[in-house]
């Protein structure tokens, strides 16, 4: 497949193709402009893949610009986290990291230009009064009593704002547009507000800060952005974007295009709701493996390639829709099925003793991947006492049960055929030990007499077992659309985290965070970056071997 054929197609790329063909632009320049007031989530990944992917495919540029206009909510911690997430996803920004605060002097000068043109005024209504005067979708707004101040008075008052002569909330700079506009965003929007807060980039130089709608379009223009890509909730804001650029002296006028944001089943994307999950300790942090944050997905074991593939599959449209969680899970499942080495771990262990096994043990050879001989093999210790999963044994079972049954045979993965002879139980009737015999002539081969042994189960040698904690993560919410619930916290899935104490083959003592394994017959797991220790590794389940939620929804 050629590079051109491999490219995704969507309405934004069609616009870019037309712009390049007509000569409107000779290169493509996009940007990703997050506000550093939280951690990025899977929805941001869609925007990252779109903006950086377009720049990559068209051999253009993509800027990383922090929209840092509200020092009260922002922190350098988020700046560092966002940079790390973008790089982890496999993208590189053009030149240095940019900040909207880099342009505060120019933004201030453009605000003065609007005042001089009679297109901006200092308003002393309270924030509550401004909301009241703005009107509603069905009622037009009404003019502020301060709307018709002279240019000279507005210049003096704006300087007083900058000098700290007003308290917070006592004055703001507003655009003078149309209080009767059918678009509320055009009813004299606020351009500057007062905040006495230290800024992570500019310190205490400023006590007035520009609003997003004023900052965004000018920053795009100053950086020479050709295509400014936003999600659909900014569709009406495009009118203000164009109004600002049309009314200041700036040579470049980028165009804004909107696409649908990512909505994903069984989770929430609202920063407020995600913050509530963290602050109320429903999860252990922003990187909790159940969170839709990029850091959470990474800790859970998602790969950058799987997230990029997911963003490619869902595409870019103008229609809002909700994506099934199974779509995301299938991307990581396919990636790890192809690339993850295999290992054995027993999650719910029960002891199995092979009574006729002689000697202290031996090493058996196992492929690291059944379909990729180039991934090599490993030596796994085998002995007369092993751990198997409790679900892999029954005293009685029907023919559909292809595991170990009392009086019947099963194969141990890459080892011997065994037969269950008897069991030992505790006072409550729970099986504590399964006693078996083995066929010594069946190491990785069929029985000599031709009898068929259909089932295969995994195991771990008890003498060599590595004790591990296994965290079985599942979907955070029990309903597809938790945001629609009266109280989204009431539909948290109580089974979203189940912690088990199990045993793994000893090779897993060398596991490192970020490297996935398929625990055979169990699912895909990775070492937890936060809780693991050399003495007690902790493994997170990334995803199961198959979609167990499909039956739930039927």
Swiss-Prot record:
Q: Which organism is it from?
A: Shigella flexneri
Q: What is its EC number?
A: 6.1.1.18
**GO biological process annotations for this chain's record?**
glutaminyl-tRNA aminoacylation; glutamyl-tRNA aminoacylation
PANTHER family from the xrefs? Answer: GLUTAMATE--TRNA LIGASE, GLUTAMINE-TRNA LIGASE
GO cellular component labels: cytosol
A Pfam family the protein falls into: tRNA-synt_1c
How is the subunit organization of this protein annotated in UniProt? Monomer.
Which of UniProt's keywords are assigned here?
Aminoacyl-tRNA synthetase, ATP-binding, Cytoplasm, Ligase, Nucleotide-binding, Protein biosynthesis
Gene3D superfamilies attached to this UniProt entry: Glutamyl-trna Synthetase, Domain 2, Glutamyl-tRNA Synthetase, Domain 3, HUPs, Ribosomal Protein L25, Chain P
Which protein are we looking at? Glutamine--tRNA ligase
Q: Where in the cell is it found?
A: Cytoplasm
Motif 'KMSKS' region, residue range(s) on this chain: 268-272
List where the motif 'HIGH' region lies: 34-44
Origin superkingdom: Bacteria
